[in-house]
Amino acid sequence: MTIPEDLKEYLSIDPEVMHGKLCFKGTRVPLAVLIDNLEEGIGLDEFVEEYPSVTREQAQAVISWEQRQIRQAVGLDLAR
């Protein structure tokens, strides 16, 4: 798995951390935890309270990146 260039500041993959799962940089919190929480209706504020090692900036950067990917995939104008 390769981390997108835009997210290298926020995410990391290290075989020594969480068996090489994609995690928030400097933490042991897998990205999948954020996605699972959002799918369950848990908001960003609650997520960063529950996982204080993940900064709001890290989580928001990933969410924003995902939104851009979706908009691009469905052909929505990215220039806002």
Kindly give the residue locations of the regions a language model identified.
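Intrinsically disordered, low-complexity and often Lys/Arg-enriched segments
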Residues: 1-7, 77-80
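A short, structured beta-strand/loop element
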Residues: 5-45
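Long, charge-rich, low-complexity alpha-helical segments
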Residues: 29-80
